[in-house]
């Protein structure tokens, strides 16, 4: 059994296979996932798992050089936005419109669907390098 905190086998495999600049999205329960993009559906019920919990676990495994979020998160979900800033720390954040973020998910290696019911809780993480 793995010793690290991420134990979802498919998600672990996807992260391990990501190269520099590849992207992966973490989505709330309502974000449309484009056809042809892998869906890793973790949603069990309303707010399980939460968006921020899922982000913390993924950040424990993935080297991230940039995070992309929708500008709408700041206004529509300010508490989540404030916590997100703390979690991301020094990772640069790019803000785009929600519509642009949805288009950008077409290029992601996968979209991780959570049970999150808070609006605009979506993020795209761009893989960095550890050296």
Swiss-Prot record:
Top-level lineage group: Bacteria
Gene Ontology CC terms, in alphabetical order: cytosol
Species of origin: Coprothermobacter proteolyticus (strain ATCC 35245 / DSM 5265 / OCM 4 / BT)
Pfam assignment, any one: RbsD_FucU
Amino acids binding substrate: 28, 98, 120-122
GO BP field: D-ribose catabolic process
Gene Ontology molecular function: D-ribose pyranase activity; intramolecular lyase activity; monosaccharide binding
Protein name per Swiss-Prot or TrEMBL: D-ribose pyranase
Keywords: Carbohydrate metabolism, Cytoplasm, Isomerase
Subunit: Homodecamer.
Keyword Signal: no
PANTHER family: D-RIBOSE PYRANASE (PTHR37831:SF1)
Known catalytic reactions: beta-D-ribopyranose = beta-D-ribofuranose
Residue stretches in coiled coil: none
Gene field: rbsD
């Amino acid at each position: 059994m793995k010793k690290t905190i991420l134990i979802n086998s498919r998600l672990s495999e996807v992260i391990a296979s990501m190269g520099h600049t590849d992207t992966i999205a973490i989505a709330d329960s309502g974000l449309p996932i484009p056809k042809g993009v892998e869906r890793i559906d973790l949603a069990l019920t309303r707010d399980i798992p939460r968006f921020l919990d899922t982000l913390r676990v993924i950040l424990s495994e993935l080297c991230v050089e940039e995070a992309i979020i929708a500008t709408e998160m700041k206004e529509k979900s300010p508490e989540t936005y404030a916590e997100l800033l703390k979690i991301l720390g020094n990772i640069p954040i790019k803000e785009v419109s929600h519509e642009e973020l949805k288009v950008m998910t077409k290029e992601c290696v996968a979209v991780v669907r959570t049970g999150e019911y808070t609006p605009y809780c979506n993020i795209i993480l761009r893989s960095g390098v550890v050296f």
